[in-house]
Structures are given as structure tokens and as C-alpha cells.
């Protein structure tokens, strides 16, 4: 199929808005400029729309296999398409875990059969993610593993992490870490701060995360491994990563939209839709995360999309599972909060959600250039609408942002040159 995307505006390398047309043939961008329709082309009128590279989210929980009541590869990828994402990376905390070549091959086939967008599957670092025995990295890489992580739990022993890093480095693969020292969790369900004290809840201290990162960056230096920090959340963690980068250690980090937008003082009552891991931290932590993103300490934004059933989230704050959904709301939330207010440029936000994650993991995506894969998202920056969790394509409706009015909604998504979402409907 050939498309000519007409009359939209793109961003130059300096952030200037310019009107350009884009010709897509098959999976590839063939031309960008002032173009006329050719025979057989379908014209997409993008007048008044921002034409962005397809968004990239390298931290998503699709729950399949084993958690299909919460989400599936099909429903999660539909949610991604609606949110403007063309590439997502699926975490391995499923049942069974993708810890063998056979399980990874099954997962790759399932992705091919049911996904609307590109899904990059993580493999687990340890068998069943219990931290005792390392998986066969080489076999998993051959079967399609994108990188290695035990996300959802931290690798508790330095020896296991060091061996994993050495093996990953030998295969030119990344170790992606959920940073949490179990001995410092203390049964917590929210951040250790004023909110936890006021509500009589066990709190998770900031040191639980930062001490793990401090250990791991030194191991990564010794192993010469690409080490990536998931969902960084504390000011101390930002300081550790900043110092590690200054020392030349190959470390990258991501931050989730909710940690940029909220702190624990924003939690209304005991609403479990504000419960995630890591938890919403203090105001100073949120400010440090924003500063770290802007100065390059933190590399990109990832949603940590974590769907749960309504029944699960109706439990108490102590008992309800951690996690919120984010694929369908991330761009408009961040655009409204940071770009419309003038704190960030549009280019900064788009880079954090496209080229920056691609560069961090050497992926050939995230650019609008001739010859590139045609991953393209059309966004109506002026479209203002209230978030409605009942309209989500994800099975999960666990969001703290329901009914919030925001601007900057994706209206069409092309993945590898195919229209996979058009406002109001999924295209398969």
C-alpha cells in the first residue's frame, strides 16, 4: 500500500515546525518534501496535524501468557496503537516466564499472530525470575530476545547480577533492572513519607531503590555492560546515575510519566489507582526527575503500562497490586503538563518518546527520514478531550487520570507503513 501524508507539519532537527508531505511505499518512507499525488496513492490529509515519528515505549506489561484477564498481546498492542506507539517492549513477568528458547519462540509467534504494532520481547535473567539460576542468554537472544531483565523483582545478589552482566556484555545485550533491595522494602505499599505516616501505611524508603542502583553501576563498570535502570523514581537515584555517567559507565535510565506528573502528596484518600512500584515519591524527587530528564541524566520516558482487573484494584491500599496503565494517555498528559505550559519544547517531549529510547538501545526507529521504516503518528495538538477509562482499548482501566481533560491526542498511527489506528477505530 502507498500513502501520501499531505499538509501536516513535522519538526526539523532544531525544533522548527515546517509543513512537509511524506510518501510511504510499503514499509518505508520514500520521500519527504512538497509532493504531489502519484497514481495509486491513497492521500491522508494531515492538515493542522503534527506528524511525529511513531512513539516508542520500552517498558510495557502485556501479561500474556498467564495473565490474560488483565491484558493480552492483542489488547495491549491495540492500546499502544491508539496511544501513538509503534514499538513497545514486553516485560517477562508472565506465567510461564520467557526463560527458555522454546518459550521465547512461542512468544515471538504469538506476537506475529496477534500484535498490531512492533513488540520487542524481553527475556528473563533468571529461571522463573527467582534469582537462583541464570537463563541461557545465547539461546534466548537467538530466539528473539530484545534484552534481559527480571523486571518486577530486583536481582538480590551481587554475584548473580555480575555474572549476568558479563554474559550480556559478551553477547552485546543490555541488562535492564528493576532496582529494589528486598531487605529495605519493609512490607511497604507507598513511599515512606508524610502520606504513609498520615494514613498508617508501611512505607518504601527511597534508599531501597538507590542503593541497588549504586551497587549495579559499579558491577556494570567492572563487566563493561550496558546497564539500564527501569522507572527511576528518587532524587538519590538520579544523583547515582548522573555520577555514573560522568565516570564513563555505560548506564541509561528511564522515567515513567506518572513519576513526572505526580508525587505522594497528590494521592486522594486511599485510591489504589495511585499505587505503583516504584511508588509516587516526594515533591523533591519529582523535581529531581524532571531536572534529570532535561540534563540528560535520564535518557527517555517509558510508561511501565501495568494493567490489572477492577476487582484486584478494589482491594485495600496494602493488598491491591502495584501498577497503572499508561499507553493510551502518556502523550496527551505530558504534552498538556509540560509543553503547553512552556516548560518543555515539543521537540524535547517527542525526542524523549522516540529517538532517545531508540538511541539508548541502538534501535533503527524513531526518525522521520527517507529510507527509514514508516512508523508515523499523526497528533492533533489542539484536540482537547477528557480521559475516559471506559473507552480504553486496553483491558486495564486502572488509571489515576480518569476524567482529566488534556490536549494532544494521537488520531492516526502507521506501523511499518500500515495504518493500525485511525481516530475512533482500530485498523487491522
Swiss-Prot record:
Cofactors (names): Zn(2+)
Protein species of origin: Bacillus pumilus (strain SAFR-032)
PROSITE patterns: DIHYDROOROTASE_1, DIHYDROOROTASE_2
EC number: 3.5.2.3
Gene Ontology CC annotation, any one: cytoplasm
Keywords for this protein: Hydrolase, Metal-binding, Pyrimidine biosynthesis, Zinc
Name of the featured protein: Dihydroorotase
Binding locations of substrate: 61-63, 93, 277, 308, 322-323
Pathway terms, separated by semicolons: Pyrimidine metabolism; UMP biosynthesis via de novo pathway; (S)-dihydroorotate from bicarbonate: step 3/3
Binding locations of Zn(2+) 1: 59, 61, 151, 304
Active site: 304
Residue spans crossing the bilayer: none
A biological process term (GO) from this entry: 'de novo' UMP biosynthetic process
GO MF entries: allantoinase activity; dihydroorotase activity; zinc ion binding
Listed SUPFAM superfamilies: Composite domain of metallo-dependent hydrolases (SSF51338), Metallo-dependent hydrolases (SSF51556)
Enzyme class: hydrolase
Pfam families for this protein: Amidohydro_1
Record InterPro entries: Amidohydro-rel, DHOase, DHOase/Allantoinase_Hydrolase, Dihydroorotase_CS, Metal-dep_hydrolase_composite, Metal_Hydrolase
Cofactor binding description: Binds 2 Zn(2+) ions per subunit.
Ligand binding (Zn(2+) 2): 151, 178, 231
Record NCBIfam families: PRK09357.1-2, pyrC_multi
Protein family per UniProt: Belongs to the metallo-dependent hydrolases superfamily. DHOase family. Class I DHOase subfamily.
CDD domains in the cross-refs: DHOase_IIa
Task of the protein: Catalyzes the reversible cyclization of carbamoyl aspartate to dihydroorotate.
Amino acid at each position: 500500500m502507498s500513502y501520501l501524508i499531505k499538509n501536516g507539519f513535522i519538526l526539523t532537527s532544531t525544533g522548527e515546525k515546517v509543513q512537509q508531505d511524506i510518501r510511504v511505499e510499503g514499509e518505508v518512507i520514500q520521500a519527504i518534501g512538497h509532493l504531489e499525488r502519484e497514481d495509486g496513492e491513497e492521500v491522508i490529509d494531515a492538515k493542522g496535524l503534527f506528524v511525529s515519528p511513531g512513539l516508542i515505549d520500552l517498558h510495557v506489561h502485556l501479561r500474556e501468557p498467564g495473565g490474560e484477564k488483565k491484558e493480552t498481546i492483542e489488547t495491549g498492542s491495540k492500546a499502544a496503537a491508539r496511544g501513538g506507539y509503534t514499538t513497545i517492549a514486553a516485560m517477562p513477568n508472565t506465567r510461564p516466564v520467557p526463560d527458555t528458547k522454546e518459550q521465547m519462540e512461542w512468544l515471538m509467534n504469538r506476537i506475529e499472530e496477534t500484535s498490531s504494532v512492533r513488540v520487542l520481547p524481553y527475556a528473563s535473567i533468571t529461571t522463573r525470575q527467582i534469582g537462583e539460576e541464570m537463563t541461557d542468554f545465547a539461546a534466548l537472544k537467538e530466539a528473539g530476545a530484545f534484552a534481559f531483565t527480571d523486571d518486577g523483582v530486583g536481582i538480590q545478589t551481587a554475584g548473580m547480577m555480575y555474572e549476568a552482566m558479563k554474559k550480556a556484555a559478551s553477547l552485546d545485550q543490555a541488562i535492564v533492572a528493576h532496582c529494589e533491595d528486598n531487605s529495605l522494602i519493609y512490607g511497604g505499599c507507598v513511599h515512606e513519607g508524610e502520606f504513609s505516616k498520615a494514613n498508617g501505611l508501611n512505607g518504601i524508603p527511597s534508599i531501597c531503590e538507590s542503593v541497588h542502583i549504586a551497587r549495579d553501576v559499579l558491577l556494570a563498570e567492572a563487566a563493561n555492560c550496558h546497564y539500564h535502570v527501569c522507572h527511576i523514581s528518587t532524587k538519590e537515584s538520579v544523583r547515582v546515575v548522573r555520577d555514573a555517567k560522568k565516570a564513563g559507565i555505560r548506564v541509561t535510565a528511564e522515567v515513567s510519566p506518572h513519576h513526572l506528573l505526580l508525587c505522594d502528596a497528590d494521592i486522594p484518600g486511599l485510591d489504589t489507582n495511585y499505587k505503583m512500584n516504584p511508588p509516587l515519591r516526594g515533591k523533591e524527587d519529582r523535581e529531581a526527575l524532571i531536572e534529570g530528564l532535561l540534563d540528560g541524566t535520564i535518557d527517555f520516558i517509558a510508561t511501565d503500562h501495568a494493567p490489572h482487573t477492577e476487582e484486584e484494584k478494589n482491594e485495600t491500599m496494602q493488598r491491591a497490586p502495584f501498577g497503572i496503565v499508561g499507553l493510551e494517555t502518556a502523550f496527551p498528559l505530558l504534552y498538556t503538563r509540560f509543553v503547553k505550559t512552556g516548560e518543555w519544547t515539543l521537540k524535547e517531549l517527542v525526542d524523549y518518546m522516540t529517538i532517545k529510547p531508540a538511541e539508548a538501545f541502538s534501535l533503527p526507529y524513531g526518525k522521520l527520514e527517507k529510507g527509514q521504516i514508516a512508523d508515523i503518528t499523526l497528533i492533533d495538538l489542539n484536540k482537547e478531550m477528557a480521559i475516559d477509562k471506559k473507552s480504553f482499548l486496553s483491558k486495564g482501566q486502572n488509571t489515576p487520570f480518569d476524567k482529566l481533560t488534556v490536549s494532544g491526542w494521537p488520531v492516526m498511527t502507521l506501523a511499518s507503513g500500515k495504518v493500525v489506528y485511525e481516530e475512533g477505530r482500530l485498523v487491522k
